[in-house]
């Protein structure tokens, strides 16, 4: 199976320019290709993972990746299929975000080994030097307004209004492709399906200005079995930065994937061979309640993004929380596992009597309710049932001197911090 056939079989190809010519190019020898990442935040998120995975697949097949961070385009904002114009960020903010994204990409793509080691480029290095007049003369003249207006991403914004700044974005991205083609012999761009218009602006510029052929592969927008855009957890983006989305949260995200999506996502998001995935499918369909596919999916993705140690920690947190073994976890692990539960910062003058504290922390509404819950055995401190109405929280209840976990009933967790 060729690399292109592999990408298609995994569901990683949505659209391409001349497919036969592209396949021949990939089969004939090493291809230099690039993917661009605009710094729109201080971290990449799950939506960026699919093009990253395609980059890695192509690199493993011997092709040479260029990771472009948009130090210039990030100052402008891509209008593609956005309802409103992006807020412009300061140069300092974009510069900091560029550095964060560079650091993240270095975890996923090999920048150190072999003749196809990846290279990082920043489009501010050439965009920052070209004058406005030169840009209009040497780049702008190759694009007709009719051609630019025909792009679906622009059409959708014309009625509501689009600034010239955003209208010109496709030319900037096209110029990126042209520069990389001239300076690094890059002949292929990989990106999201929403980038088709911007990416083909690059192939058009290379054709008209350099009389060369270049190619584009877009990856699909990933949706779940219900058609909902995939990559958010309870409305929040799943980030690739452990400080924004912990490895435990990411592990839980993949563990909760619907049965109907699990095998498809194994093909898209992991490097397991298609034969291995077929074996998993057979076992999974025989006993879906065991959630084998989801467990393997969670393991593979969390390990790829955060490493083996983070994966093992996520499994430990999951198992110990499920068993109620709070004291077997460190404060750091509990912060991951209970990051979304209500918490209360205990003040130095708070009464540490359990009845008083349950009310003060907002765990129950009244002292009467607190006493009833305690007497009924519904209150647990760090996994241990407390029924003594006179119990006072003390130093021994502080895990790593940082927090105490209170559980009310079977599933309602609360965290007290000090």
From Swiss-Prot:
Biological process according to GO: tyrosyl-tRNA aminoacylation
Recorded GO CC terms: cytosol
E.C. designation(s): 6.1.1.1
'HIGH' region, short sequence motif: residues: 39-48
SUPFAM superfamilies assigned to the protein according to its UniProt record, in alphabetical order: Alpha-L RNA-binding motif, Nucleotidylyl transferase
Record-listed L-tyrosine binding positions: 34, 169, 173
Subcellular location per the Swiss-Prot or TrEMBL entry: Cytoplasm
UniProt feature coiled coil, ranges: none
SMART domains named among the record's database cross-references: S4
Database matches in Gene3D superfamilies: HUPs, RNA-binding S4 domain, Tyrosyl-Transfer RNA Synthetase
Domain S4 RNA-binding residue range list: 352-418
Annotated residues for binding of ATP: 232
A Pfam family per the record: SYY_C-terminal
Domain of life: Bacteria
Keywords per UniProt: Aminoacyl-tRNA synthetase, ATP-binding, Cytoplasm, Ligase, Nucleotide-binding, Protein biosynthesis, RNA-binding
Motif 'KMSKS' region: chain residues: 229-233
One GO molecular-function entry: RNA binding
Subunit relationships: Homodimer.
Function: Catalyzes the attachment of tyrosine to tRNA(Tyr) in a two-step reaction: tyrosine is first activated by ATP to form Tyr-AMP and then transferred to the acceptor end of tRNA(Tyr).
Family as reported in the entry's similarity comment: Belongs to the class-I aminoacyl-tRNA synthetase family. TyrS type 1 subfamily.
Name of this protein: Tyrosine--tRNA ligase
């Amino acid at each position: 199976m060729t690399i292109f056939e592999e990408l298609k079989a995994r569901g990683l190809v949505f659209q391409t320019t001349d497919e036969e010519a592209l396949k021949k190019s990939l089969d004939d020898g090493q291809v230099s290709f690039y993917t661009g990442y605009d710094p729109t935040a201080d971290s990449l998120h799950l939506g960026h993972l699919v093009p990253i995975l395609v980059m890695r697949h192509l690199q493993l097949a011997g092709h040479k990746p260029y990771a472009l961070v948009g130090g210039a385009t990030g100052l402008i904002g891509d209008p593609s299929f956005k309802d409103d114009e992006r807020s412009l960020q300061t140069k300092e903010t974009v510069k900091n975000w560029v550095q964060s994204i560079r650091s993240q990409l270095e975890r996923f793509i090999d920048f150190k080994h072999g003749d196809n080691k990846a290279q990082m480029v920043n489009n501010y290095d050439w965009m920052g030097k070209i004058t406005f007049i030169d840009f209009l003369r040497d780049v702008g003249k190759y694009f007709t307004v009719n051609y630019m207006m025909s792009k679906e991403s622009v059409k959708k914004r014309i009625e509501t209004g689009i600034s010239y700044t955003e209208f010109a974005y496709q030319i900037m991205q096209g110029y990126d492709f042209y520069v990389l083609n001239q300076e690094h012999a890059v002949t292929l761009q990989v990106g999201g399906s929403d980038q088709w218009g911007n990416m083909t602006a690059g192939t058009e510029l290379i054709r008209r200005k350099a009389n060369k052929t270049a190619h584009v592969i877009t990856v699909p927008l990933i949706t779940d079995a219900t058609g909902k855009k995939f990559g958010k957890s309870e409305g929040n983006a799943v980030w690739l930065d452990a400080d924004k989305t912990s490895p435990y949260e990411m592990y839980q995200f993949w563990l909760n994937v619907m049965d109907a999506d699990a095998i498809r996502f194994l093909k898209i998001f992991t490097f397991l061979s298609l034969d291995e995935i077929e074996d998993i499918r057979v076992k999974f369909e025989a006993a879906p309640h065991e959630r084998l596919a989801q467990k393997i999916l969670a393991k593979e993705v969390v390990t790829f993004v955060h490493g083996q140690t983070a994966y093992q920690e996520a499994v430990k947190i999951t198992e110990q929380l499920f068993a109620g073994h709070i004291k077997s976890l460190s404060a750091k692990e509990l912060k991951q596992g209970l990051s979304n539960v209500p918490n209360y910062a205990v003040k130095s003058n708070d009464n540490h009597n359990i009845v008083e504290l349950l009310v003060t922390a907002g765990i129950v509404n009244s002292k009467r309710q607190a006493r009833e819950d305690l007497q009924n055995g519904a209150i647990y401190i760090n996994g241990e049932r407390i029924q003594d109405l006179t119990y006072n929280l003390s130093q021994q209840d502080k895990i790593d001197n940082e927090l105490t976990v209170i559980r009310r009933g079977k599933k309602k967790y609360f965290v007290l911090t000090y």
